Amino acid sequence: MADGSNREYLNLSTGQLVELALARGEGELTANGALVAKTGERSGRSPNDRFIVKEPGSETDIEWGSVNKPFEADAFTALWNRVETFLADKDTFVSNLEVGASKEHYQPVKVTTQYAWHQLFARNLFIVPEEFNAADKPVWQIMNAPDFECVPERDGTHSDATVIINFAERKVLLAGLKYAGEMKKSMFSVQNFLLPAKGVLPMHCSANVGNDGDTTLFFGLSGTGKTTLSADPKRFLIGDDEHGWAPGGVFNIEGGCYAKCIDLSQKNEPVIWDAIRFGTVLENVVTDENRVPDYSNSTLTENTRAAYPLEHIAQRKLDNCGAEPHAVVFLTCDVSGVLPPVSKLTKEQAAYHFLSGYTAKVGSTEMGSTAAIQSTFSTCFGAPFFPRPAGVYAELLMKRIESFGSQVYLVNTGWTGGPHGIGKRFDIPTTRAIVDAIVSGELKDVETEYLEKLNLHVPVAISGVDSKLLNPINTWEDKAQYAEFAQHLADSFKANFEKYQVPDSIKDAGPNA
């Protein structure tokens, strides 16, 4: 503390943090009681500004490249000290939190923020433990200083802002960024590196459980339906975005949800709608003159968000954990309109589609992305967050599926009857009916039809779903054009998969080019 006039606020409650955020002009209260905050020009993740410190302990285990960019250890130390000095004469907010709802696999983390609303976000998204760090593990530190401006020539950064992970020192530095999602994703990347060494598969997925204790996982990129489909009024939510799958069960890595708000409606997403109340942080959501949120307004960004603790969800699994999954769903948003709404996958096909991660960037979470929708291949359905080589995660997935006997499904939440702009997107009720059939076990032994070009088996009938939708060629008026698009998609899969060194049994499990 430089001159004694600044304060360090430790482990403040939700009410205290909201009060201080308002008093400091960091945000406004909305009509539904949530705190709305704006993040400025960076309204999404900044992948070009994310680095990992290159040090002997982790260097050989990280897949260095455009996602995991190296940062010099000496430069990190200098920048950390510089940011620490910057915060020394300012009020700061500190909480002792945990990442991972598993007694064995949690990581304790001390979160220091310059803004009160960032601390509220951290307490909503991470786990607020009854007893901090009961197992007395070494503590991670997050330091978040959004008003600090990096100088690339001096600091070795890419721009005026940065996110840097240091595994040797257990530190995460965020500087120059107001977008709060960087905090949660940085600790997800940390767990994605640490968990595989313990035989645990970290996953970019949501999870829920039924009355009988049956767990279902939903993998997918942002905007493909993870949060929406796991928030099922008939089931109990474990979590909406990040989980670990250990021998014996799955656990949430987080203690809250970070739901997309664009076009949110009470009718289609009642669980999320009801969770947005006092204590929730709304990020970049526009409000009207009466402070009523306008969820259809994307003036600031398509990537509007609500961050709330799991306590805001009535139907949730109280311990944030579940049994191993009977059903695993890969959510893909196919902009070409070629893929069927649901396919059953073999273990090898599961590994192939997990590594491929074919989907679309829908209302992308990355800074600078516009509303334009484009197809993409994102390894493990979350390429930006996985530090180790992809094969490590695919191998763990196959191991877990095989040892427990989980059934994997590929579900298309994208287009049918033509590509984006011509066809129409599967509506949420149709996808929910498919998911209901998956979780009930209806599709486990259902009769299927083989689609040769796509090398996929699709059910011939599903309760509550128009059978015409199940084989995509039936929804296209121009069958020749469908064949053309299917060929193009198959070729794209093959071209993308060439980079993977995997057994032929997995290589042969994809579409037939």
Swiss-Prot record:
EC numbers, comma separated: 4.1.1.49
Substrates-to-products reaction catalysed: oxaloacetate + ATP = phosphoenolpyruvate + ADP + CO2
SUPFAM superfamilies: PEP carboxykinase N-terminal domain, PEP carboxykinase-like
Cofactor note: Binds 1 Mn(2+) ion per subunit.
Magnesium recorded as keyword: no
Chain sites annotated for binding ATP: 185, 204, 220-228, 269, 305, 431
Pfam family membership, one: PEPCK_ATP
GO (cellular component) term, any one: cytosol
UniProt KW keywords: ATP-binding, Cytoplasm, Decarboxylase, Gluconeogenesis, Lyase, Manganese, Metal-binding, Nucleotide-binding
Residues holding substrate: 45, 179, 185, 305
Chain sites annotated for binding Mn(2+): 185, 204, 241
Cross-referenced InterPro entries: PEP_carboxykinase_ATP (IPR001272), PEP_carboxykinase_C (IPR013035), PEP_carboxykinase_N (IPR008210), PEPCK_ATP_CS (IPR015994)
UniProt-listed PROSITE patterns: PEPCK_ATP
Compartments (UniProt record): Cytoplasm
Enzyme superclass (EC): lyase
Pathway: Carbohydrate biosynthesis; gluconeogenesis
Cofactors required: Mn(2+)
Organism superkingdom: Bacteria
Gene Ontology biological-process annotations: gluconeogenesis
PANTHER family, per the entry: PHOSPHOENOLPYRUVATE CARBOXYKINASE (ATP) (PTHR30031:SF0), PHOSPHOENOLPYRUVATE CARBOXYKINASE ATP (PTHR30031)
Record text on subunit structure and interactions: Monomer.
Function: Involved in the gluconeogenesis. Catalyzes the conversion of oxaloacetate (OAA) to phosphoenolpyruvate (PEP) through direct phosphoryl transfer between the nucleoside triphosphate and OAA.
HAMAP family: PEPCK_ATP
Record family assignment: Belongs to the phosphoenolpyruvate carboxykinase (ATP) family.
UniProt protein name: Phosphoenolpyruvate carboxykinase (ATP)
Organism: Shewanella halifaxensis (strain HAW-EB4)
